[in-house]
Amino acid sequence: METSSLCLSDLPSLTDLIIGSDENCNNSYSFYCCKKLELVNLPALQTLEFGLFAFHLASALHLKSDLRFGSFPVDLPNLISVSFNNTSFSKLQSLEWSGMTHVANISIGNRCMNLVSEMEFSDFPCLEHLSFGSDCCRNVKDLKMRGLGQLRVISIGDHSFYKTLHTDFVELPVVSTFTVGKKVFPSLVRVNMECGVAAAVSRVVVSDTFRSVMTNICNSNSCFCLFHRYAGSILACQRKWSPTFHRSLPRAFRHCCLP
């Protein structure tokens, strides 16, 4: 469709909005050339999904539940799920969202958002599941996850965050599953971690690449701080890795950091 702008407003009973489709359907490339999207006064909307190649030419996305902002005004007070299917918003360069107080699930598909340079998740009090597909967010230099009190699952697919230099995983008290695929974060130079109570971390799956990068950072002169909250207190904060510090960590968390 050649439409350059799309506005959906004043639909009080709309609960699910799916624009485009996944790879198994025929109506892909929806609003491929659309550069402006307006979603206003959709008070009942709970699920927002963008399909394959949807909004391919859009360069900025602002999801703010209580504000009209930029070229993507959004008023979605009850939104609980956001999904970007494969290759949707592939030209996106700027991503901002806030006030999404009910969102529990965010899914970013394969090859999405490869031009975005910064990504932050810090205003999602109900977020429980955050997943990234393969080959996505490859140009993100700074990745921040902060103050996500309900986040339980983080999943990152192969070859994603290829150019990421700095990461913050801070104040994530209930994370229980942390999965990192192959060749993820190969460029990391600084990691700041505080992934919650160790007893809650029941499943940690990381690739050899990520383990190697973490080990190199720990043993180099880079400014590296690993924070770990255990029994309600900070267990350790060290500039460089040491065998003693490694042994002091609970087993599940050790596997997240070293081969």
Question: What is each stretch, according to the model?
Answer:
Residues N26, N85-N86, N105:
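N-linked glycosylation sites
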Residues G20-S28:
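Acidic/polar low-complexity surface segments
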Residues T3, L14, C25, C34, ...:
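Conserved hydrophobic position(s) of the canonical leucine-rich repeat
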Residues G20, G51, K64, N85-S88, ...:
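Periodic glycine anchor positions in long extracellular repeat architectures
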Residues L6, L17, L37-V40, L48, ...:
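Conserved hydrophobic beta-strand positions in leucine-rich repeat
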Residues E23, K64, N78, N85, ...:
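Intrinsically disordered, low-complexity polyampholyte segments enriched for Lys and acidic residues
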Residues N219-S233, C237-C257:
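Low-complexity basic/metal-binding stretches
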Residues M1, S9-P12, Y32, V40-P43, ...:
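Inter-repeat linker/turn residues at the boundaries of leucine-rich repeats
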